[in-house]
């Protein structure tokens, strides 16, 4: 396969050194070195990592590798990889593609990897290395991050730098790595190196599935990883993908990651699982399988967790031990242990193209699809504490999972992101070691990921930009669970998520696959994953996925958050049982993404919640992104990080608060990056609170970003943020925190509403002091709240921002999904519930809560529901009254919300969880939301979906269902405003886990109003928890939002009550808490929403049993009261549309014209512009490759080379025409060739010569020169360019020729000759006739032009080259007569366009313009060519001189020039005809010509030009059609006429050029 730049792996595959150089540059180690000296290699690749450990492993491994036998796995890899050069790549050069088997074997031999060795290795490594290895590895891992060495984590992994993923944590993983290492080089390198090429190959597939999952895994995956790392220098991370959990026996190889990832699952608990994701393909993020069950597993987890160095990562995270401390144990720390493996992480290499397709994941059955779908990789940590996140750089960046916890740094692939990362970074510092990963914030590129976080935090790396691959894996507590869940999830579309579900307890995974859909959505990558937490506290997290497709904005933040909360917590808080962490990372692309995110939120609900009631389980993830879409999603992206800091607070709410504040502040900056939020539910309330707040804030900021509010707004916009987390903590403060959180959420809703919310928020905040600080970002409220309770401030702040972001808010709801796992048992714990309520989006909460009632009617029931749990509370949710504190939180009034109320709130909260459970409630909410949302219809869908799930069942079941359903629902919701839906889902999830799980927020209302309602509902749950007040506030503020009330529902059932009950009650409104009464506005809104819901989801099947029933069912249609649009209305709209569209069209035209003008000017420049210089530099490498290829061709296949040359120079007569053509072709050097491409008969060679650097190029046809052409064809062609004047000159090849391949343009190649510092396009494939593609002798394209002619689609096309020249030649040579021959060149161009390719780019415009004024057009055409401007300019000058007598030489012009000689002489004639004849060609020609010029240009330029040409094409085509050919055929204006005779082809070729020139 050819490299994009024209190099072919095949050329270097056999030579390891060459291959290595090819892939990585000579400085990289050869594969041999890598294999043999793991330490060295690592150092080379990963300087930072702790090689020490690696070495040990490495040694161990190396010996094994020594054995030559290739492993089976490798063999199968070979097969996969074989056809692709990518395969060939690899750190070492493996065998050539020609001998793929050899390559693999070679690698294996070098590495001494044989089946036996692998087995031995596994045995040896596993036992001894298991944990220990990890630790040593971890040091490496951190460093790896950068290098992608993360792999180091496992010593062995370290061995091969390439695979980070490999890192099995443990020895075994190590083994894996090693194995992988060896193969990796082959495989990986191949894959990686070429990731682009290979992508499809899908290392992942390669991964072996050997039973010894580890070993097998490693083979493939590491390789992949390695490849990634190696292959792309840029991306070190790539290697990462492979992650090996340590499972000594990985039972399953889990699935292959689509691309490179590999999964290994551990058979034994102890075994590490290897989960590697495909590093290569981002999308393939692998999945994780975690299969382990035992604590041991946990260990493995640790390993995995490390993202890069999985195990190491953990350690790096914070613990030396390598396993994330917490993790290992933590993993197990709690139930987690059981679900230890969790990491899956996939690394996408940013830079590499991902094989998106890969996704094949054979992933374990479990997850196979899910991950694949989303490209994003998520890391999930199974263990809360452990969470070491796998940081993964989503793409480029490498993850630095630094060994140090604090160290997380995010590497972003992009500079910008990097900056952001730094910013983010700081929060991490705060956090403890868990630096938040910084999302690259705004990065536009998805790549950035930041994640960074060391193990501490969980990071979810963003997925890549790719759309998606996310993978999440969350193991359930029990490994088994996971699988189950996975399986279920897979069903989901997005499937990304695995739900964890099995046990409701423990960690449910909540990932929502919803994401998957999101992926669909495109942006969304969301693949959030939740880590379920098993134990009460374990939390996991992650959820979020960045939806951004485009945006990388992954939220690392969340990670940080998570890290902070969780991880950090875990580190620090490990103490706290509730280590749970949630990560939410959401990115929300504003658009679809946001929605997707929402779903995320839903998933969150899955939070295991602790059925137990443990607060820990919160998952929080919310899709905040939804809103962001509305708002500026991007913002949200980066910001969230701050949250990470929260964790520190865990100890005490207040204490935490300050940290939070700190974090938040960063947050605001991050704010833009807002979406992600992480909620961690620390065991203790405080931490939870903090997290929550932070997350809230995060949300806010995001939202804010939308809004002016700096801090808050972003958060708001981040709908994704999820808040939720509540520890069961008994502490009042903790509860307060939760409340605050709730409040925050509520406020958030309020925010959207406006200040009112703020006030309440403050109160809420008070309880949550921690949050307060976080809220600080939202400056406005912050202060007030801050004082009393930090939380409040944030909340309040949030509210303000929210209002503006209101709409966003709506979307945000999903993020709501608070996971509250709040423990139902403890009232205080309720707090967590509150968090849930948080529902950031008011709406969402409603959905989850009674809010679901959101639709007017539903709400009431909700309320009742809430009531049942706590009579007062339910009301509270609705109104502040129900719980003073809640109320306060809810709104300013809520301010009163005091800690005291908090307790009740807490209690309520639990119920709320249940409330969320209630399907009914959620459904309504959903309805509600939808209505408000602009896209009401969709919402309805969402609602329905949600509903089903909720109703579906008791929490656990519902949860699961939800997951499944949710995705669609969520998705829907998102769109519709579906936020609510998501939230609901989450709610139900939460409930499932625990009654308290409290609601998820239901989605937010799509529209601002709806949002308000949503918010209101959220408050309700909060209220129940203590959020209720919020609700009211929201209601008030969002009176329009009516839905807010819905939230109340959450409160609805007592924690104790089964969700089922609540569920049932939901509609009935289990118990209405009359206490809280929504404001009139809220009630009114509620009714409207109810009605809207009724109308949107009418019961059209049952008869009207009574008048009352009929009235009840029909009355809601009043919402549709109003007149249908009248014809005049339609007319008016049409007129407006026409006006706007016309204006837009004009602007577009003006822009295009301007661009063309610029191009023209550029083409006329004598000296290259900075742009051209830059392009030259960019393409120099490619050019070198092309030259090498040409030389090789000339040496190896002179005949071919000559023939192409000849084509170019085919007829000497054509010479004149050729000149013209050549001008073009030579221009392109290949262009002529291309033109000639039709090697057919034109032996004539077209030579374009640039007189001076800027001088006009002269084109000559060398009839006799054919040989010259062939030998020189490329160089000669270039020469020709130089020797333009001398027909024979072409034969000299003194100028080197570069060939550019335009990726955008398929099959287009440009050849540029560099002369006197100028580049000339000798050959432009674009110019070649369509059939010409054969000119393939791209190298000889120039020479080929003549041949091209034959291909010219139309004879004219052929003539294009020939004719082209001929027409011009007519005067000069036999342009016309020859035209047919000449066409080659022109042909090429024309061909490209339509056989008018050469002239096409310029031709199109030129053609059009040219019709009128041929002479002028040429100049223009040149301009068009500007892409090739530089060369073009020189040639164009020539061309002009010749054709127009204008000086503009253009590479294309060179063709034109060639024609110029002839063309110029006969310029006028052909063009006209040509245009006509070449009409189709013209367009192509136009484009084509662009190509040649493009050749000169850099790819970028070319692409710009191409775009323009494409735009122009339609118009240009018509006008240019004949013209293009004419242009091709002839030089610009004049030549066209000449060409005209042959018009078609000649025009195409020269004309095309000329035309281009003229046109330009």
Swiss-Prot record:
Residues 1227-1236, 1485-1515 have a biased composition (Polar residues). Residues 86-96 have a biased composition (Gly residues). Keywords: Acetylation, Disease variant, Intellectual disability, Isopeptide bond, Nucleus, Phosphoprotein, Ubl conjugation. Residues 624-664, 747-780, 881-896, 1005-1028, 1264-1281, 1401-1412 have a biased composition (Low complexity). The keyword Acetylation applies. The modification Phosphoserine is found at residues 919, 1413. Residues 53-99, 624-688, 723-949, 974-1028, 1049-1075, 1215-1300, 1324-1424, 1440-1560 are annotated as: Disordered. It comes from the Eukaryota. There is a cross-link at residue 1313 (Glycyl lysine isopeptide (Lys-Gly) (interchain with G-Cter in SUMO2)). The modification Phosphothreonine is found at residue 921. GO terms for biological process: chromatin remodeling; negative regulation of cell differentiation; positive regulation of cell population proliferation; positive regulation of DNA-templated transcription; positive regulation of stem cell population maintenance; regulation of transcription by RNA polymerase II. Residues 726-736, 791-806, 814-831, 843-880, 932-941, 1331-1356 have a biased composition (Pro residues). Expressed at moderate levels in heart, brain, placenta, skeletal muscle, and pancreas, and at lower levels in lung, liver and kidney. One of its GO terms (molecular function) is transcription regulator activator activity. The modification N6-acetyllysine is found at residue 1057. Component of the multiprotein chromatin-remodeling complexes SWI/SNF: SWI/SNF-A (BAF), SWI/SNF-B (PBAF) and related complexes. The canonical complex contains a catalytic subunit (either SMARCA4/BRG1/BAF190A or SMARCA2/BRM/BAF190B) and at least SMARCE1, ACTL6A/BAF53, SMARCC1/BAF155, SMARCC2/BAF170, and SMARCB1/SNF5/BAF47. Other subunits specific to each of the complexes may also be present permitting several possible combinations developmentally and tissue specific. Component of SWI/SNF chromatin remodeling subcomplex GBAF that carries out key enzymatic activities, changing chromatin structure by altering DNA-histone contacts within a nucleosome in an ATP-dependent manner. May play a role in BRD4-mediated gene transcription. PANTHER family: BRD4-INTERACTING CHROMATIN-REMODELING COMPLEX-ASSOCIATED PROTEIN (PTHR15572:SF1), GLIOMA TUMOR SUPPRESSOR CANDIDATE REGION GENE 1 (PTHR15572). It is linked to Coffin-Siris syndrome 12: A form of Coffin-Siris syndrome, a congenital multiple malformation syndrome with broad phenotypic and genetic variability. Cardinal features are intellectual disability, coarse facial features, hypertrichosis, and hypoplastic or absent fifth digit nails or phalanges. Additional features include malformations of the cardiac, gastrointestinal, genitourinary, and/or central nervous systems. Sucking/feeding difficulties, poor growth, ophthalmologic abnormalities, hearing impairment, and spinal anomalies are common findings. This is BRD4-interacting chromatin-remodeling complex-associated protein. It comes from Homo sapiens (Human).
């Amino acid at each position: 396969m050819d490299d994009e730049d024209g190099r072919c792996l095949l050329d270097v595959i056999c030579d390891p050194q060459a291959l290595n150089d090819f892939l990585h540059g000579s400085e990289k180690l050869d594969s041999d070195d890598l294999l043999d000296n793991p330490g060295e290699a690592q150092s080379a690749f990963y300087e930072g990592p702790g090689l020490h450990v690696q070495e040990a492993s490495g040694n161990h491994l190396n010996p094994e590798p020594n054995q030559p036998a290739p492993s089976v796995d490798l063999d199968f890899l070979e097969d996969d990889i074989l056809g692709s050069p990518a395969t060939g790549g690899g750190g070492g050069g493996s065998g050539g593609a020609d001998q793929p088997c050899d390559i693999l074997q070679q690698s294996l031999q070098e590495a001494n990897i044989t089946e036996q060795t692998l087995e031995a290795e596994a045995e040896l490594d596993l036992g001894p290395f298991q944990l220990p290895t990890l630790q040593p590895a971890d040091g490496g891992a951190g460093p790896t991050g950068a290098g992608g060495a993360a792999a180091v984590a496992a010593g062995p992994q370290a061995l091969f730098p390439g695979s980070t993923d490999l890192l099995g944590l443990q020895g075994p993983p190590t083994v894996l790595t090693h194995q992988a290492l060896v193969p990796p080089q082959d495989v990986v390198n191949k894959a990686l190196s070429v990731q682009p090429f290979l992508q499809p190959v899908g290392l992942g597939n390669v991964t072996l599935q050997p039973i010894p999952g580890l070993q097998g895994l490693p083979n493939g995956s590491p390789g992949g990883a390695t490849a990634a790392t190696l292959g792309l220098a840029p991306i070190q991370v790539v290697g990462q993908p492979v992650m090996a959990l340590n499972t000594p026996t990985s039972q399953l190889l889990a699935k292959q990651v689509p691309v490179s990832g590999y999964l290994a699952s551990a058979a034994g608990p102890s075994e590490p699982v290897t989960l590697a994701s495909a590093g290569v393909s981002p999308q393939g993020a692998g999945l994780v399988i975690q299969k382990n069950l035992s604590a041991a597993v946990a260990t493995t987890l640790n390993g995995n967790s490390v993202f890069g160095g999985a195990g190491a990562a953990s350690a790096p995270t914070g613990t030396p031990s390598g396993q994330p401390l917490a993790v290992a144990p933590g993993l197990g720390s709690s139930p987690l242990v059981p679900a230890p493996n969790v990491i899956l992480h996939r690394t996408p290499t940013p830079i590499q193209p991902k094989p998106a397709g890969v996704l094949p994941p054979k992933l374990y059955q479990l997850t196979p699809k899910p991950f694949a779908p989303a490209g994003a990789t998520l890391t999930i940590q199974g263990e809360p504490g452990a969470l070491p996140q796998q940081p993964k750089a989503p793409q480029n960046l490498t993850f630095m999972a630094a060994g140090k916890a604090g160290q997380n740094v995010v590497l972003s692939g992009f500079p910008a992101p990097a900056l952001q990362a730094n910013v983010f970074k700081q929060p991490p510092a705060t956090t403890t070691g868990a630096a938040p990963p910084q999302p690259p914030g705004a990065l536009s590129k998805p790549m950035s990921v930041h994640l960074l976080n060391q193990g501490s935090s969980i990071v979810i790396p963003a997925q890549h930009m790719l759309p998606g691959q996310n993978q999440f894996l969350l193991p359930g507590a029990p490994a088994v669970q996971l699988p189950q869940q996975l399986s279920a999830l897979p069903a989901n579309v997005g499937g990304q998520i695995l739900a964890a579900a099995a046990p409701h307890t423990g960690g449910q995974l909540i990932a929502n696959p919803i994401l998957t859909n999101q992926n669909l959505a495109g942006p969304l990558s969301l693949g959030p994953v939740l880590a379920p937490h098993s134990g009460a506290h374990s939390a996991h997290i992650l959820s979020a996925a960045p939806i951004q497709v485009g945006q990388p904005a992954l939220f690392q933040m969340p990670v940080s958050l998570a890290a902070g909360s969780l991880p950090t917590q875990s580190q620090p808080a490990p103490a706290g049982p509730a280590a749970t962490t949630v990560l939410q990372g959401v990115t929300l692309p504003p658009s679809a993404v946001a929605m997707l995110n929402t779903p995320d939120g839903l998933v969150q609900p899955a939070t295991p919640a602790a059925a137990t009631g443990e607060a820990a389980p919160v998952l929080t993830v919310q899709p905040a992104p939804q809103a962001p879409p509305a708002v500026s999603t991007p913002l949200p992206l980066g910001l969230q990080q701050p949250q990470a800091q929260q964790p520190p607070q865990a100890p005490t709410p207040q204490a935490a608060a300050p940290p939070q504040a700190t974090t938040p502040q960063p947050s605001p900056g991050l704010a833009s990056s807002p979406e992600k939020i992480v909620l961690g539910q620390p065991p203790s309330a405080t931490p939870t609170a903090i997290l929550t707040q932070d997350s809230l804030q995060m949300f806010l900021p995001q939202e804010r970003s939308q809004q002016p509010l700096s801090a808050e707004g972003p958060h708001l916009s981040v709908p994704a943020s999820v808040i939720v987390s509540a520890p069961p903590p008994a502490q009042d403060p903790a509860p307060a925190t939760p409340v605050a959180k709730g409040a925050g959420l509520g406020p958030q809703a309020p925010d959207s509403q406006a200040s009112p919310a703020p006030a309440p928020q403050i109160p809420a905040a008070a309880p949550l002091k921690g949050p307060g600080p976080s809220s600080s970002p939202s400056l406005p409220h912050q202060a007030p709240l801050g004082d009393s309770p930090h939380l409040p401030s944030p909340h309040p702040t949030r509210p303000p921002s929210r209002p503006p972001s209101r709409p966003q808010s709506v979307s945000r709801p999903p993020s709501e999904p608070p996971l509250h796992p709040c423990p139902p048992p403890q009232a205080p714990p309720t707090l967590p519930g509150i968090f849930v309520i948080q529902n950031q989006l008011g709406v969402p909460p409603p959905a989850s809560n009674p809010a679901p009632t959101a639709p007017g009617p539903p709400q009431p029931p909700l309320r009742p529901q809430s009531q049942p749990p706590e009579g007062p509370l339910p009301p509270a949710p609705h109104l502040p009254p129900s719980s003073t504190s809640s109320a306060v939180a809810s709104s300013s009034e809520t301010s009163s919300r005091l800690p005291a109320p908090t307790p009740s709130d807490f209690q309520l909260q639990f119920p709320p969880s249940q409330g969320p459970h209630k399907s009914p409630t959620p459904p309504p909410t959903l309805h509600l939301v939808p209505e408000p949302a602009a896209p009401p219809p969709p919402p309805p869908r969402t609602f329905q979906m949600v509903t089903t799930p909720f109703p579906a069942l008791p929490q656990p079941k519902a949860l699961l269902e939800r997951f499944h359903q949710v995705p669609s629902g969520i998705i829907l919701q998102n769109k519709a405003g579906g936020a609510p839906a998501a939230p609901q889902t989450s709610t139900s999830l939460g409930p499932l886990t625990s009654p308290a799980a409290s609601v998820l927020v239901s989605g937010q209302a799509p529209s601002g109003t709806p949002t308000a309602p949503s918010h209101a509902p959220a408050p309700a749950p909060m209220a129940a928890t203590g959020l209720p007040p919020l609700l009211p506030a929201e209601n008030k503020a969002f009176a329009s939002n009516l839905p807010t009330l819905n939230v109340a529902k959450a409160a609805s059932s007592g924690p104790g009550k089964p969700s089922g009950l609540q569920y049932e009650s939901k509609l009935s409104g289990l118990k209405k808490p009359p206490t809280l009464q929504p404001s009139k506005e809220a009630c009114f809104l509620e009714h409207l929403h109810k009605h809207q819901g009724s109308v949107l989801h009418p019961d059209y099947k049952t008869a009207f049993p009574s008048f009352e029933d009929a009235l009840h069912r029909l009355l809601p249609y009043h919402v549709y009261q109003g007149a249908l649009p009248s014809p005049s209305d339609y007319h008016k709209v049409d007129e407006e549309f026409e006006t706007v569209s016309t204006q837009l069209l004009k602007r577009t035209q003006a822009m295009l014209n301007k661009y063309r003008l610029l191009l023209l000017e550029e083409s006329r420049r004598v000296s290259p512009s900075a742009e051209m210089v830059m392009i030259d530099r960019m393409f120099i490498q490619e050019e070198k490759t092309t030259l090498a290829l040409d030389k090789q061709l000339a040496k190896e296949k002179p005949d071919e080379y000559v023939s192409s040359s000849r084509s170019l120079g085919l007829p000497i007569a054509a010479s004149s025409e050729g000149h013209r053509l050549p001008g073009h072709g030579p221009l392109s050097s290949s262009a002529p060739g291309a033109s000639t491409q039709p090697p057919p008969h034109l032996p004539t060679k077209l030579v374009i010569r640039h007189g001076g650097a800027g001088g006009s190029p002269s084109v000559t046809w060398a009839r006799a020169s054919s040989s010259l052409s062939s030998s020189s064809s490329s160089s000669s062609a270039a020469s020709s360019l130089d020797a333009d004047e001398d027909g024979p000159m072409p034969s000299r090849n003194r100028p080197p020729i570069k060939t550019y391949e335009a990726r955008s343009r398929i099959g287009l190649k440009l050849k540029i000759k560099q002369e006197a510092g100028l580049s000339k396009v000798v050959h432009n494939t674009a110019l070649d006739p369509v059939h010409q593609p054969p000119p393939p002798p791209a190298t000889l394209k120039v020479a080929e032009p003549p041949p091209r002619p034959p291909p010219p689609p139309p004879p004219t096309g052929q003539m294009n080259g020939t004719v082209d020249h001929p027409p011009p030649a007519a005067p000069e040579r036999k342009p016309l007569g020859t035209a047919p021959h000449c066409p080659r060149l022109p042909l090429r161009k024309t061909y490209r366009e339509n056989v008018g390719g050469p002239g096409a780019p310029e031709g199109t415009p030129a053609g059009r313009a040219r019709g009128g004024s041929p002479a002028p057009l040429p100049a223009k055409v040149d301009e068009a060519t500007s892409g090739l401007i530089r060369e073009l300019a020189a040639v164009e000058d020539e061309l002009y001189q010749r054709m127009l007598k204008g000086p503009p030489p253009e590479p294309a012009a060179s063709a034109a020039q060639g024609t110029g000689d002839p063309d110029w002489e006969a310029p006028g004639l052909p063009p006209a005809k040509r245009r006509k004849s070449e009409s189709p060609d013209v367009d192509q020609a136009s484009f084509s010509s662009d190509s040649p010029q493009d050749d000169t240009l850099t790819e970028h330029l070319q692409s710009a030009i191409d775009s323009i040409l494409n735009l122009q094409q339609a118009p240009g085509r018509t006008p240019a059609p004949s013209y293009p050919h004419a242009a091709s055929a002839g030089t610009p204006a004049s030549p066209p006429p000449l060409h005209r005779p042959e018009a078609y082809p000649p025009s195409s070729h020269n004309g095309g050029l000329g035309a281009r020139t003229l046109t330009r």
